[in-house]
From Swiss-Prot:
Belongs to the sulfur carrier protein TusA family. This is Putative sulfur carrier protein AF_0554. It holds the Pfam family TusA. It comes from Archaeoglobus fulgidus (strain ATCC 49558 / DSM 4304 / JCM 9628 / NBRC 100126 / VC-16). Gene3D superfamilies: TusA-like domain. The active site is at residue 26. SUPFAM superfamilies: SirA-like. InterPro entries: TusA-like (IPR001455), TusA-like_sf (IPR036868).
């Protein structure tokens, strides 16, 4: 579970890349995220913006299985979430 302080910290983390995949559904949310991470360098941070509720659970779990670090998952709108991922 992400605490309020961690949520506040996530707003201060500057992402190297932003992937806006609102409108996409699973499994495409993970596929797009994985492809974007493959383009990035180790240690860089990706902010993924999604609006497909099942992806809020599935994308973080899948990228962690790939070895990346999920820094935060935060609801940023009525039906939008921001996921911060640090590439392994």
């Amino acid at each position: 579970m992400i605490t309020m302080s961690r949520r506040a910290e996530s707003r201060q983390i500057e992402a190297n890349e932003v992937l806006d995949i609102r409108g996409e559904v699973c499994p495409f949310t993970f596929i797009e995220t994985k492809l974007k991470l493959e383009e990035m360098k180790s240690g860089e941070i990706l902010r993924v913006i999604i609006d497909h509720e099942p992806a809020v659970r599935d994308v973080p779990r899948s990228v962690e299985q790939e070895g990346h670090e999920v820094l935060s998952v935060e609801k940023v709108g009525e039906k939008e979430w921001s996921i911060l991922i640090k590439k392994k």
